[in-house]
């Protein structure tokens, strides 16, 4: 007869009316009993012939993709002018005095952050925007381009202008100026000798400093005159209008420009498309503009050749239209859905490209991308705004993968010890936290995103048109991309983006200037940054608590008024460092703080309500007697594992599930096992904070017997049959807890000390977890353990009791600030349980 749930509870000693523990508990360590129970609950039967179930409620296999939903009305979030102050260390020192070694080290890591992967794989521009929404290809293309443009305007991206230069917006950092070692000198030569125009001091070539001579030429039509190659070569020796551009030997490569991406990437849908190339890769140093009076710099890539008057068409003859978008203007409409109807809507479509406020030199950057991008909802609760997902997973794959640095995350007990107190709490929201941290420009060539332009994107995705070779282009080929779908999409998008449609239809390559999400280095750097800032805040306000996990920053103070003044001071400090906070998202929690998925109050920690609801839902949908795919089990264990510390039996209860995942076998829930788990998770107990104290109770064991020292009392007992030493030590600890009720026990066994009972026989692990819940252990060396003699059967010998002080740990949660204890503002008779009374020591 299968084991009933009631019987199983009794077996695990979870009911009150269990027999004496010294008899019942050792039985649970018996292998035979564990095996019989596993068979009864159908836990051991891993090989099943029935087909597996691949979906339980919302849980599907780990690698099945949930199809994201496209929203044509997504808003692109705005990014305020985020600029982390470069002298952040000095500012912190003014605020709090000299920084500790740890704070210094962490802040240096991100000023600037560096990223040097072993191998970088470059992908063609077509892979720049992922075709994630096949139904909304054009819409997604423009929304993504607009998002990237917004990021570039906000100073978060560099725009690749040529192989060795990039432009950006926003305030420059010193390391962005250091790149130009030599002086960049523009020279235009006149007949009466050279006159150097705009000598540049080392540093950034800024828009304003380029001087009117160049700026005026930049303002002229981007589609400037196209020289005839033959004439140009013929005039090359002529001295009269010759121009020299002198650049000190430096990483600019050849002066002037190559047409971007001469390789197959760029057979874009345009003729020798000066302006198309120009947008993907701006000519070096604003094409090192050096032209004789009155001629626009064509920007068309020829090795810094200049065009004397008679060799090139003059401006009045009209520019040569080599821009895919503008070519439609002069063409005959091919149908009522021809794109020329849209292009003829307005006269001035604006420039083909935009350029940043500053130009810097970069290491060699190919006209390629290293990761694809696409848009998704900002979060499950906010579907009106979009979020850019960047896929740089190439750096985490294969044998060239980068091993990202590890960093400490506080475990549940450390977090509770630290934050469980009767403080008032408030949490701050750092807006676009990742985009605060600057990257060194040398990392730019490894983190490239972009797109190959609308013409090519549409050509690649529409079945009837082929990607046309630039050389043999006819007007008919131009119309290959016209279709009703494209026409309707563009008409709708015209209402949103207006003349920006033209700008966005050009190719572009952008590199990250701030750390992107989607690279394993970013979470590490963000954690280092926020923990250093919180450490500074804690030292500045020693009677308060500031703590962070990634971009989640919480502040605690003893009263609400105190908290508000702390909030004002900290906000002012963070803003002075250039950290942008989102005041609308500041949450005041009162005395129970919501943080990292937990609710933390003076009573301890529990999971947040939405997680509890998810668990209830999971059990409602969980099928019985049907094999469930192990990948789905991974999902279930992920959810249940989060709340396991709050249940009676903890992680050991999930061991059968872990075993099936390891064996990559399906798991079948028997009615009893499901009922057992369900009841475990319906009643959650808070995890309380550990208190410091003096250890009075000691336990020890040998394979054959156990001994306890409770105050001055000694006890001993023997096991029916010899047990493995770890099992014996665990039993002794359980006896000590049940006999004395003490929450602090001394033991010399490291496994018991670790409080991980998953490696013990299954039934014993479950029972011991419940008996020892909320117990703290202190390590006592065997030689000094007062329970050592009783465990060996010697009751007559008394070793003196040790004065063993127990200090709860806050783990490696970077509380490097030693905080002085604060006199309580409450009356003395009220015990103020706060981590603030305990001076923090570095771990």
Curated annotation (Swiss-Prot):
Catalytic activity: DNA(n) + a 2'-deoxyribonucleoside 5'-triphosphate = DNA(n+1) + diphosphate; Endonucleolytic cleavage to 5'-phosphomonoester
Keywords for this protein: DNA replication, DNA-binding, DNA-directed DNA polymerase, Endonuclease, Host-virus interaction, Hydrolase, Inhibition of host innate immune response by virus, Inhibition of host RLR pathway by virus, Magnesium, Metal-binding, Multifunctional enzyme, Nuclease, Nucleotidyltransferase, RNA-directed DNA polymerase, Transferase, Viral immunoevasion
Annotated ranges, domain Reverse transcriptase: 357-600
Region spans: Spacer: 178-346
Alphabetized SUPFAM superfamilies for the sequence: DNA/RNA polymerases
Site positions for Priming of reverse-transcription by covalently linking the first nucleotide of the (-)DNA: 63
Gene3D superfamilies membership: 3.30.70.270
UniProt region (Polymerase/reverse transcriptase domain (RT)), positions on chain: 347-690
PROSITE patterns registered for this protein in UniProt: RT_POL (PS50878)
Enzyme Commission code(s) on record: 2.7.7.7, 2.7.7.49, 3.1.26.4
Ranges of compositional bias, category Low complexity: 223-235
An MF annotation (GO) of this entry: RNA-directed DNA polymerase activity
Chain residues that bind Mg(2+): 429, 551-552
One Pfam entry name: DNA_pol_viral_C
Written domain comment of the UniProt record: Terminal protein domain (TP) is hepadnavirus-specific. Spacer domain is highly variable and separates the TP and RT domains. Polymerase/reverse-transcriptase domain (RT) and ribonuclease H domain (RH) are similar to retrovirus reverse transcriptase/RNase H.
Family, as annotated: Belongs to the hepadnaviridae P protein family.
UniProt miscellaneous comment: Hepadnaviral virions contain probably just one P protein molecule per particle.
Function: Multifunctional enzyme that converts the viral RNA genome into dsDNA in viral cytoplasmic capsids. This enzyme displays a DNA polymerase activity that can copy either DNA or RNA templates, and a ribonuclease H (RNase H) activity that cleaves the RNA strand of RNA-DNA heteroduplexes in a partially processive 3'- to 5'-endonucleasic mode. Neo-synthesized pregenomic RNA (pgRNA) are encapsidated together with the P protein, and reverse-transcribed inside the nucleocapsid.
Protein name: Protein P
Species: Hepatitis B virus genotype B2 (isolate Vietnam/9873/1997) (HBV-B)
The gene coding this protein: P
